[in-house]
């Protein structure tokens, strides 16, 4: 029992829940290394997967995904503790993105809505029976309350067709419900793929579309992202009418196969509705899927290529309104860090096991119990004790110590190099441009975001950040295996920028840290279409982050602490704190320059190429 407890504790130290640790150990013959690989390779979660069509019987992992999800009124939506903001943003758009939600996250309410919308002919042609084949028994899936609420919205043209956050309507009320659904789905695609504010991955959405298409009879599993999306749109929509001839839907459908890999995410200028994105919605949809809240490492295998979206500096014919370019393969970075961390735990396990054996031998031979000795001192004592009695074992212990020192130092070096690269992001080039810091992701469950300060003006106890018009928030997602009313999906609390800076500097993590910026092209044509909300958002941060990314890694105006270097810290075996990582702290004095290709350069793997 004691040995099993030790193995479970080892896996829990790797970020695995106790239930997952027990399950994986049972499946792998109680071998820790095999159990860890079974978990982190995704085999454990895969073995628990339930077919999509039976997901209606699963209780939702997020209790807040209930009937209140359908309420269009912001004041009626579920709110975070302290009335800081809204966790979920229900709106009339929800039915349009329901297929993605129920396939990716297996949310029953999303499936219910999708089934009902399907049968009502809002998403499909009513005379096309093939669309209804996978969903025959609607009444078996719909609750009476959700059905009545959805009926109410559909009878009133899906309530307000405004965007996700409850802003004023951007779509003409004269449109019929089917056209509204078309436009809102187009906007949903644009949001999911083209957020100005976050680095997005496409794996979830592509996988969702593939599975939906499979449910409709398409068994081609080797389609590319572009082919998959095009096939999905072809199945779900009739050709757009003249009013939407230049929308994302028609632009995408008209592309040839050779064009899709390069231009799949391009949009024609002035063709799409005015987007009014909210940072909370981005976080809800993209950074906190329910699966990542339940299992600390399960999200790793879902992370795909990361894209960055920018606004081109000209509005010439043929220039896309948005330009998305691949930046890094985030899954590779994370998995490499994961493997290194696993290796570290394996080394420490062997290391500590050896020390425990010699501690026991030391006690039996000398009668002295080593209770207040740390690892380094115990090693020294063991070596001195063995030097004359067993030189071979003494040499072996010394070799073990040196091997661990070397491997840990290498890990520190690699981790610091990665974090330093991500903390500087851009290099100084020619021609000035401006950008501002929007969010800091230290690890998947710890995110800092910057919002307008209006949400906390009534709270006199909150110290504002350096900018009185902005407020930083810590969004900490739960890492527990279950989510309940007492353990919400995330906690949001206001913080100062100095706290963000300090946490970024001192937090020990084996994840790549991400600094997320919004940039604006100072030489952009006045005809370039940029939503007003985005313009205002960019202008506010530019005042405080206009000197970022020029290679400067310290700022006396932000902190009076001595600047940290990016050199590798030594692993001190006598240091109770264990592994220490040196991370350069964040700067608000930020300046970067524009390259001749109208893009801020990313170092090496972070490089972004833009068409001129």
From Swiss-Prot:
Single GO cellular component term: cytosol
Cited InterPro entries: UBA, UBA-like_sf, Ucp6/RUP1
Cell membrane in keyword set: no
Keyword Nucleus: yes
Main localization of the protein described in the UniProt heading: cytoplasm
UniProt keyword terms in alphabetical order: Cytoplasm, Nucleus, Phosphoprotein
Span of domain UBA: 3-42
Coiled coil: none
Location(s) in or outside the cell: Cytoplasm; Nucleus
Domain of life: Eukaryota
Protein name: UBA domain-containing protein 6
Naturally occurring in which organism (per UniProt): Schizosaccharomyces pombe (strain 972 / ATCC 24843)
Classification of source organism: Eukaryota, Fungi, Dikarya, Ascomycota, Taphrinomycotina
């Amino acid at each position: 029992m004691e040995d099993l407890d030790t193995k479970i504790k080892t896996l829990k130290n790797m970020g695995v829940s106790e239930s997952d640790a027990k399950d994986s150990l049972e499946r792998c013959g109680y071998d820790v290394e095999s159990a860890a690989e079974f978990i982190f390779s995704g085999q454990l979660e895969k073995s628990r997967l339930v077919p999509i069509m039976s997901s209606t019987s699963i209780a939702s992992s997020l209790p807040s995904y209930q009937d209140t999800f359908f309420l269009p009124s912001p004041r009626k939506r579920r709110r975070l503790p302290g009335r800081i903001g809204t966790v979920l943003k229900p709106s009339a758009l929800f039915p349009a993105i329901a297929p993605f939600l129920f396939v990716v996250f297996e949310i029953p309410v999303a499936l219910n809505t999708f089934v009902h919308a399907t049968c009502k002919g809002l998403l499909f042609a009513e005379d096309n029976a093939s669309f209804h084949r996978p969903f025959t028994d609607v009444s078996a899936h719909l609750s009476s309350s959700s059905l009545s609420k959805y009926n109410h919205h559909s009878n009133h043209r899906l309530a307000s067709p405004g965007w996700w956050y409850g802003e004023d309507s951007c779509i003409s009320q004269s449109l019929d419900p089917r056209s509204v659904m078309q436009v809102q789905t187009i906007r949903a695609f644009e949001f999911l793929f083209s957020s100005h504010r976050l680095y997005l991955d496409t794996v979830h959405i592509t996988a969702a579309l593939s599975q939906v298409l499979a449910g409709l009879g398409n068994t081609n599993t080797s389609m590319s992202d572009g082919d998959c999306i095009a096939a999905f749109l072809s199945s779900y929509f009739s050709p757009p009418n003249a009013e939407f001839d230049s929308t994302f839907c028609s632009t995408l459908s008209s592309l040839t196969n050779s064009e899709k890999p390069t231009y799949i995410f391009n949009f024609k200028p002035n063709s799409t509705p005015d987007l009014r994105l909210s940072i909370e919605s981005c976080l809800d949809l993209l950074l906190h899927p329910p699966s990542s809240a339940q299992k600390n490492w399960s999200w790793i295998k879902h992370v795909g290529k990361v894209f960055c979206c920018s606004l081109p500096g000209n509005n010439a014919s043929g220039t896309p309104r948005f330009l998305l370019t691949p930046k890094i393969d985030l899954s590779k970075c994370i998995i490499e860090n994961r493997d290194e961390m696993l290796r570290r735990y394996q080394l420490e396990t062997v290391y500590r096991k050896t020390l425990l054996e010699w501690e026991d031998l030391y006690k039996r031979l000398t009668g002295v119990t080593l209770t207040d000795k740390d690892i380094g001192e115990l090693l020294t004592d063991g070596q001195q004790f063995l030097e004359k009695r067993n030189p071979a074992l003494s040499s072996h212990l010394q070799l073990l110590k040196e091997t661990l020192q070397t491997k840990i130092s290498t890990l520190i070096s690699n981790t610091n190099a990665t974090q330093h690269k991500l903390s500087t992001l851009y290099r100084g080039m020619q021609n000035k441009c401006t950008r501002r810091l929007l969010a800091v992701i230290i690890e998947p469950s710890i995110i800092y975001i910057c919002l307008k300060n209006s949400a906390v003006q009534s709270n006199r106890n909150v110290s504002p950040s350096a900018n009185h018009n902005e407020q930083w928030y810590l969004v900490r997602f739960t890492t527990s295996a279950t989510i309940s009313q007492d353990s919400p999906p995330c906690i949001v609390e206001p913080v100062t920028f100095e706290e963000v800076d300090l946490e970024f500097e001192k937090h020990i993590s084996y994840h790549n840290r991400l600094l997320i910026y919004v940039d604006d092209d100072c030489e952009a044509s006045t005809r370039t279409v940029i939503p007003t909300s985005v313009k205002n958002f960019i202008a506010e941060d530019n005042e405080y982050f206009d000197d970022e990314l020029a290679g400067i890694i310290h700022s006396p105006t932000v902190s009076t602490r001595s600047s940290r270097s990016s050199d590798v810290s030594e692993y001190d075996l006598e240091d109770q704190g264990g592994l220490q990582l040196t991370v350069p702290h964040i700067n608000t004095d930020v300046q970067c320059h524009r390259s001749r290709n109208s893009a801020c350069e990313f170092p090496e793997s972070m490089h972004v190429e833009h068409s001129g």
